């Protein structure tokens, strides 16, 4: 096993061609090693920011099991690196850390099938791109044409995707293809700050920024004919993939609660981790 020094002085022990270890001895207080999955080529990109430092910080978390893991897509994030993975044991002081999930509540990707074939649109691609940029607000500070009242915002929190279907923005089939039919029971709108509601009021129907996207795709290969047939997928079919989240609304909710949990760092003796986005309560805290 060889050892390399990174530009930020983080020691990396090479386990094999695809795994690297940050020893728990790197920082006093680390409960486990850091384990990075990457080859030499990816490692050069990973060296470009302080994501490895975040891998080490996560290793401080109470109840963490086995190792602080980093997947090949690792890059700088909130508390955890993006691409960071950790499991905590609730019977051993395990915690819940918002930084481990990210601030963009309910961020995810949806693949939507259309009734079009590539031949239907191939001569209209430029017009399609212009139309999408014109009709779909995106980017930092973008605001949508969908205006909602304070009451409607609370309905969105409780009903989830069902609210969008009721407004004509989706179909019942969309709900059937969504986890928990688009809404997990138990949402409490009164637990959300007015500041969060203010930030979210003009952002319904917008795409956001960063790595969020709306992409028109074409099926060029099928894997598992029976499964594809059951989903109504065929070669040449046009699909739309959407990656978005809850924008400033979700960010503000998370930020509010992260700040409220700041005292937990000292309460649970996690003084070595000063990065605020790793604030946390234990799973059994009240």
Give residue ranges: language-model regions.
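Single conserved hydrophobic/aromatic residue that forms the stacking wall/gate
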Residues: 277, 282-286
């Amino acid at each position: 096993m060889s050892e390399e020094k990174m530009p930020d002085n983080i020691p990396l022990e090479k386990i094999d061609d695809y795994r690297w270890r940050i020893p728990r001895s790197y920082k006093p207080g680390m409960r486990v090693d850091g384990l990075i999955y990457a080859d030499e080529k990816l490692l050069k990109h990973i060296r470009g920011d302080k994501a490895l430092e975040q891998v080490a910080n996560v290793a401080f978390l109470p109840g963490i099991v086995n190792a602080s893991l980093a997947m090949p897509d690792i890059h700088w994030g909130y508390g955890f690196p993006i691409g960071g993975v950790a499991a905590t044991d609730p019977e051993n002081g395990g915690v819940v850390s918002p930084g481990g999930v990210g601030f963009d509540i309910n961020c995810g990707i949806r693949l939507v099938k259309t009734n079009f074939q590539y031949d239907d649109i191939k001569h209209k691609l430029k017009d399609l791109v212009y139309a999408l940029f014109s009709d779909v607000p995106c980017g930092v500070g973008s605001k949508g044409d969908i205006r909602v009242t304070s009451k409607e915002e609370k309905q969105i929190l409780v009903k989830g995707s069902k609210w969008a279907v009721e407004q004509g923005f989706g179909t019942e089939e969309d709900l059937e293809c969504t986890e928990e039919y688009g809404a997990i029971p138990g949402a409490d709108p009164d637990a959300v700050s007015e500041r969060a509601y203010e930030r979210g009021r003009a952002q319904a129907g917008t795409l956001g920024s960063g790595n969020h996207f709306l992409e028109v795709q074409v099926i060029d290969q099928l894997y598992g004919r029976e499964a594809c047939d059951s989903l109504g997928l065929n070669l040449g079919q046009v699909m739309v993939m959407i990656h978005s989240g809850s924008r400033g609304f979700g960010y503000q909710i998370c930020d509010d609660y992260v700040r409220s949990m700041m005292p937990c760092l000292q309460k649970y003796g996690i003084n070595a981790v000063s990065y605020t986005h790793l604030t946390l309560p234990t799973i059994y805290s009240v």
